Regions:
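Short, conserved micro-motifs composed of acidic
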Residues: 1-27
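Structured loops at beta-to-helix junctions and adjacent beta-edge loops in soluble globular domains
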Residues: 3-6, 18, 35-37, 193-195
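Short conserved micro-motifs at the rims of enzyme active sites and ligand-binding pockets
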Residues: 11-14, 43-46, 139, 199-201
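Generic alpha-helical structural element
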Residues: 21, 42-49, 66, 70-77, ...
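Basic, alpha-helical interaction scaffolds
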Residues: 22-91
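Arg/Lys-enriched, amphipathic patches
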Residues: 75-78, 84-85, 89-99, 109-117
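Short linear motifs embedded in intrinsically disordered, charge-biased segments
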Residues: 97-201
Length: 201
């Protein structure tokens, strides 16, 4: 897999191992359950997560037809369906487009419709009724918790550079030096985003 947007250095990728021939160059690959594309976008990851969550929605419909209580259906969605839409979210959350975020939200809305037996125009009202949360807010909280645990873990403290001058002129505490990103893609990637989240207390 080749990661490069440069036209000047866009050379053909060829790797050979002994006499086994040339390795195939792929545009996407699954790494620890996360679909990574050479374009550094998350279309394939979102599609895969929605597909897995949709399988759980089918089970919810089946359980509802058998008379399973609504509270148990909600619990099943939380433990089996929603987790599919949040898998490894610290890696990809900051790089989502609006359309990708909406596709994840729609999967939860379909699940809520399957649980209640009706489609509500008001997303917020149905979330409150079932005791669920917006996915984007949950992802933000998960990312911040992940960043805090990583920063406090002695094995990974080198990921975040500690700011020697924690106080700025505006009086805001800046615990970690933020990464200077020359491109919007890098700015929206995981490490710069997590650093900003750690500084936003």
């Amino acid at each position: 897999m080749k990661f490069s947007r440069s036209r000047k250095f866009d050379f053909p990728t060829e790797f050979t191992i002994g006499n086994s021939g040339t390795l195939e160059v792929k545009t996407e690959h699954k790494i620890l359950g996360v679909m990574v594309q050479n374009s550094l976008k998350w279309d394939s990851q979102c599609t895969e997560m929605v597909r897995k969550a949709t399988n759980c929605i089918w089970v919810i419909r089946r359980m509802k037809s058998l008379g399973v209580r609504q509270s148990l259906l909600v619990q099943y969605w939380k433990s089996e369906g929603r987790v599919m839409l949040e898998y490894a979210c610290p890696v990809w959350h900051s790089g989502l487009t609006v359309a990708q975020s909406r596709s994840l939200d729609r999967a939860q809305r379909v699940a809520m419709a399957a649980i209640t037996g009706r489609w509500e125009r008001s997303h917020s009202a149905q979330l409150r009724e079932l005791g669920l949360e917006r996915l984007d807010l949950r992802r933000q909280r998960i990312c911040k918790r992940f960043g805090e645990r990583t920063a406090n873990d002695s094995r990974h403290q080198d990921m975040f550079a500690v700011n020697p001058n924690t106080r700025t002129r505006g009086g805001k505490d800046i615990r970690y030096l933020e990464i200077n990103a020359r491109t919007s893609t890098y700015y929206k990637s995981a490490l710069p985003y997590l650093t900003r989240q750690l500084n936003n207390n």
